[in-house]
Amino acid sequence: MSQPRPLLSPPETEEQLLAQAQQLSGYTLGELAALDGLVTPENLKRDKGWIGVLLEIWLGASAGSKPEQDFAALGVELKTIPVDSLGRPLETTFVCVARLTGNSGVTWETSHVRHKLKRVLWIPVEGERSIPLAQRRVGSPLLWSPNEEEDRQLREDWEELMDMIVLGQVERITARHGEYLQIRPKAANAKALTEAIGARGERILTLPRGFYLKKNFTSALLARHSLIQ
């Protein structure tokens, strides 16, 4: 079997993207890094996004840190998901930054969360800490769009969380709010503050927040598509 090669330009079709992702299945992160002339870090403490960046290189992703999808021409977002030996997610999945001001008139249909999740290429990667980073294998990819029930679940959580933000209750939101979608602080340090609306409608400074998919949502998603043993 010939070795895969990184895509040098963004894929032109979903079929091309999925075929490339399927070629990576079974390879270790160390093998993929070496094939592209990259050094695998010892761990992810200082390189938290390294796995995502590595797979973006292999798949020809275009967006980088821009707000559009990773494969903008296809409308597809890439999500790597660390899993245990049974294929179950080990952590929540970051979706996007939560806007804490200027949300007047925003609906679920026009929201950034829905935009990011309308078409996702999920790539599970072994994530147990007992496995050295370079030896962790890439799993089988899944090209997914939310079905009617999943869309309803996400919409209900999003509406509840956005109501709290708009009504000045952002400081009261905890990771327990939302059944499948949660909001929690997203900042490397406590000094990175952003504007939000306070309880009396005043401007306050608070930690930036991000939307995350809870493990119960992604676990059910992977199980439904037979990616969990």
UniProtKB/Swiss-Prot annotation:
Tagged with keyword DNA damage: yes
A GO MF label: DNA binding
Compartments in which it is found: Cytoplasm
Main localisation: cytoplasm
Record GO biological process: DNA modification; mismatch repair
Keywords: Cytoplasm, DNA damage, DNA repair, Endonuclease, Hydrolase, Nuclease
Family: Belongs to the MutH family.
HAMAP family: MutH
NCBIfam families: mutH_TIGR, PRK05070.1
Function summary: Sequence-specific endonuclease that cleaves unmethylated GATC sequences. It is involved in DNA mismatch repair.
Protein name: DNA mismatch repair protein MutH
Gene from which this protein is expressed: mutH
